[in-house]
Amino acid sequence: MAKKGAGATRGISPVRPTRALPIGAYLKVADNSGAKVIQIIGVVGYKGTRRRLAAAGVGDMVVATVKKGRPDMRHQVVRAVVVRQRKEYRRLDGMRVKFEDNAAAIVTPEGVPRGTEIRGAIAREAAERWVRLGSIASIVL
């Protein structure tokens, strides 16, 4: 069994937020990487049931295409981490959390952010799982 805190930089979180963003969902981009809107085309590490669309939640890494943004960013396939979702989820202390939009931050395949700042709040679950995102975020809720 894994120790608490093991893998804090990538991947392990004691909270499993509701996966509310299926393939095809559009997300706002919360950082200054040059993309404005992305569409999910895959979820990294998702193991699901046959014929079921993969879905992502807060803290999950997704594969997405850039739909709106700078001309050099458009139509690129990128990796991103979901930092906000509208569907509420429950934390271990009983608090329910939801945000006003669905948003993600563009990262490299290793999890290093491509932008230098994140606009708006990001979820604590995403900041704990992806420490580099938490360090450039303006607010962590």
UniProtKB/Swiss-Prot annotation:
A GO MF label: structural constituent of ribosome
InterPro entries for this protein: Ribosomal_uL14, Ribosomal_uL14_arc, Ribosomal_uL14_sf
Pfam families for the chain: Ribosomal_L14
GO cellular component: cytosolic large ribosomal subunit
GO biological process, one term: translation
Keywords: Ribonucleoprotein, Ribosomal protein, RNA-binding, rRNA-binding
Record carries keyword Ribosomal protein: yes
UniProt xrefs under SUPFAM superfamilies: Ribosomal protein L14 (SSF50193)
Subunit: Part of the 50S ribosomal subunit. Forms a cluster with proteins L3 and L24e, part of which may contact the 16S rRNA in 2 intersubunit bridges.
Functional note: Binds to 23S rRNA. Forms part of two intersubunit bridges in the 70S ribosome.
Family designation: Belongs to the universal ribosomal protein uL14 family.
Protein name: Large ribosomal subunit protein uL14
Naturally occurring in which organism (per UniProt): Thermococcus kodakarensis (strain ATCC BAA-918 / JCM 12380 / KOD1)
Organism taxonomic ancestry: Archaea, Methanobacteriati, Methanobacteriota, Thermococci, Thermococcales
